[in-house]
């Protein structure tokens, strides 16, 4: 069964963070990143922390120049989208080989970050901010 996985040319993974959802395709190549049809540098505004976040799963396995990353991502902001891409790439690498799961799990690339915006409650101005209290 392992040989069947190796022969497949495209590896898919889905990642989520806050309200962002990323569908990631890994294709054997030279390490280029395309996000929504634009280069990864251009889409992420040349922000090194976002770029490092996207490349982290490949760097963990030493495959940063072996696979091209093609992404469709929507929702949220750039930080949420970058972390969603990271999780999607990690899941695609698990599809590539089951042996990749353990190092990716120890680095935390497969974990869904549960933090999201807290809902606003009635009687308050924001999720936790109360109107000014006057004793008299």
UniProtKB/Swiss-Prot annotation:
Keyword tags: Ribonucleoprotein, Ribosomal protein
GO cellular component annotations of the record: cytosolic small ribosomal subunit
Transmembrane intervals: none
The keyword Ribosomal protein is annotated on this UniProt entry: yes
PANTHER family: RIBOSOMAL PROTEIN S9, SMALL RIBOSOMAL SUBUNIT PROTEIN US9M
UniProt xrefs under HAMAP family: Ribosomal_uS9_B
Protein name: Small ribosomal subunit protein uS9
Source organism (scientific name): Prochlorococcus marinus (strain MIT 9515)
Taxonomic classification: Bacteria, Bacillati, Cyanobacteriota, Cyanophyceae, Synechococcales
């Amino acid at each position: 069964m392992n040989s069947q996985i190796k022969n497949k040319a495209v590896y898919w993974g889905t990642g989520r963070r806050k309200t962002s959802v990323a569908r990631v395709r890994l294709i054997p190549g030279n390490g280029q990143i395309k996000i929504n049809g634009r280069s990864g540098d251009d889409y992420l505004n040349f922000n090194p922390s976002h770029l490092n976040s996207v490349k982290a799963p490949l760097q963990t396995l030493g495959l940063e120049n072996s696979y091209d990353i093609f992404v469709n991502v929507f929702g949220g902001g750039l930080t949420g989208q970058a972390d969603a891409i990271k999780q999607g790439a990690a899941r695609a690498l698990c599809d590539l080989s089951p042996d990749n799961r353990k190092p990716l799990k120890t680095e935390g690339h497969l974990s869904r970050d549960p933090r999201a915006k807290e809902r606003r409650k009635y009687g308050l101005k924001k999720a936790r901010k109360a109107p000014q209290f006057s004793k008299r």
